[in-house]
Amino acid sequence: MSHFVKIYDTCIGCTQCVRACPTDVLEMIPWDRCKAKQIASAPRTEDCVGCKRCESACPTDFLSVRVYLGRETTRSMGLAY
């Protein structure tokens, strides 16, 4: 099943989500709009197993990384198939 991983611009570049991911879905990329000058990116979403460890590791008040699982993706994102 395919999962959607969304990185929000509230990311502070701490790398906690990248280190928490057991399948190496996330990586940090350069980004000038935060103090750390980097932001999480999800280039390998096909490897996401939906464990949501990245969400649990995120220290921001509003989770900067969210994983939407299968049917949850269509409801949360307002999409219809």
From Swiss-Prot:
Catalytic activity: reduced [plastocyanin] + hnu + oxidized [2Fe-2S]-[ferredoxin] = oxidized [plastocyanin] + reduced [2Fe-2S]-[ferredoxin]
A single GO cellular-component term on record: chloroplast thylakoid
Name recorded for this polypeptide: Photosystem I iron-sulfur center
Cofactor(s) demanded: [4Fe-4S] cluster
Primary site of residence: plastid
Protein role: Apoprotein for the two 4Fe-4S centers FA and FB of photosystem I (PSI); essential for photochemical activity. FB is the terminal electron acceptor of PSI, donating electrons to ferredoxin. The C-terminus interacts with PsaA/B/D and helps assemble the protein into the PSI complex. Required for binding of PsaD and PsaE to PSI. PSI is a plastocyanin-ferredoxin oxidoreductase, converting photonic excitation into a charge separation, which transfers an electron from the donor P700 chlorophyll pair to the spectroscopically characterized acceptors A0, A1, FX, FA and FB in turn.
Enzyme class label: oxidoreductase
PANTHER family in the cross-refs: PHOTOSYSTEM I IRON-SULFUR CENTER, PHOTOSYSTEM I IRON-SULFUR CENTER-RELATED
Places the protein is found: Plastid thylakoid membrane
Record's subunit section: The eukaryotic PSI reaction center is composed of at least 11 subunits.
Keywords: 4Fe-4S, Electron transport, Iron, Iron-sulfur, Membrane, Metal-binding, Oxidoreductase, Photosynthesis, Photosystem I, Plastid, Repeat, Thylakoid, Transport
An individual GO BP term: photosynthetic electron transport in photosystem I
Membrane topology: Peripheral membrane protein
GO molecular function, one term: metal ion binding
4Fe-4S ferredoxin-type domain sequence ranges: 2-31, 39-68
Positions of [4Fe-4S] cluster 2 binding: C21, C48, C51, C54
Cystine pairings recorded for this chain: none
PROSITE patterns attached to this UniProt entry: 4FE4S_FER_1 (PS00198), 4FE4S_FER_2 (PS51379)
Protein's gene: psaC
Free-text cofactor note: Binds 2 [4Fe-4S] clusters. Cluster 2 is most probably the spectroscopically characterized electron acceptor FA and cluster 1 is most probably FB.
EC number assigned by the record: 1.97.1.12
Organism: Cuscuta exaltata
Binding site for [4Fe-4S] cluster 1: C11, C14, C17, C58
